[in-house]
């Protein structure tokens, strides 16, 4: 069995102070996706760069204390893709640290695991428009990916389609 976990950390250092490291050790996951790192590369100590024996790969936001995603894996990926690159032709979202993909390709099987943090859109009309632009980029990107490989998308997609999916429905 392959154990896959996804966590919105709301800050990796804060999560570590609240018990992330022993929790991850006890969980024995094969792969762990994280969102909202809120840390730069220089902020990641060795204990945060590798968790529970799983080395991590990260897409940090340029803005300090903002966004960022990562993937930790017990298994060596055949490739790692940081950011959307050419799939984000305007370059709007890569500076926000929203996408990291690990590829685990073997003869006869292509598999990707993606950790992604979709924009929320709840803070302003401008951010809602940014969220729509992000969705307009992601939909064709995932369709192209699906045509060439299997993938698992994990993360914080910031989409709730029913009132029951929201803690404080307004």
What are these regions (language model features)?
Residues 31, 52-55, 134-170:
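Metal-dependent phosphoesterases centered on the DNase I-like endonuclease/exonuclease/phosphatase
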Residues 12-16, 94, 130-137:
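Soluble or luminal CAZymes and related metallo-dependent hydrolases
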Residues 2-10, 110-120, 154:
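Active-site-proximal beta-strand elements of phosphoester/diester hydrolases
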Residues 21-25, 98-108, 137-149:
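Short amphipathic alpha-helices and their capping/turn segments at secondary-structure boundaries
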Residues 1-51, 56, 61-67:
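N-terminal, active-site-proximal structural segment of metallo-dependent hydrolase catalytic domains
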Residues 84-90, 118-135, 168-170:
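Surface-exposed cleft-lining segments at the edges of enzyme active sites
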Residues 13, 41-43, 65-66, 121-124, ...:
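Short catalytic/ligand-binding loop motif for oxyanion handling, primarily in non-cytosolic enzymes
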Residues 38, 46-120:
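Structured beta-strand-rich core segments of catalytic domains in phosphoester-bond hydrolases
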């Amino acid at each position: 069995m392959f154990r896959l976990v996804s966590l919105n950390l709301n800050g990796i250092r804060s999560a570590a102070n609240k018990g992330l490291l022993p929790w991850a050790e006890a969980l024995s996951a094969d792969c762990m996706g994280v969102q909202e790192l809120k840390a730069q590369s220089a902020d990641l100590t060795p204990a945060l760069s590798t968790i529970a024996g799983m080395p991590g790969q990260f897409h940090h936001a340029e803005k300090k204390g903002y966004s960022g995603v990562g993937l930790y894996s017990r298994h060596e990926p055949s490739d790692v893709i940081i950011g959307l690159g050419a799939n984000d032709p305007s370059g709007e979202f890569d500076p926000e640290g929203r996408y990291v993909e690990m590829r685990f390709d073997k003869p006869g099987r292509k598999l990707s695991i993606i950790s992604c943090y979709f924009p929320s859109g709840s803070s302003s009309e401008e951010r809602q428009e940014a969220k729509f632009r992000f969705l307009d980029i992601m939909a064709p990107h995932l369709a192209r990916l699906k045509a060439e490989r299997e993938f698992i998308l994990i993360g914080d997609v910031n989409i709730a389609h029913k009132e029951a999916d929201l803690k404080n429905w307004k």
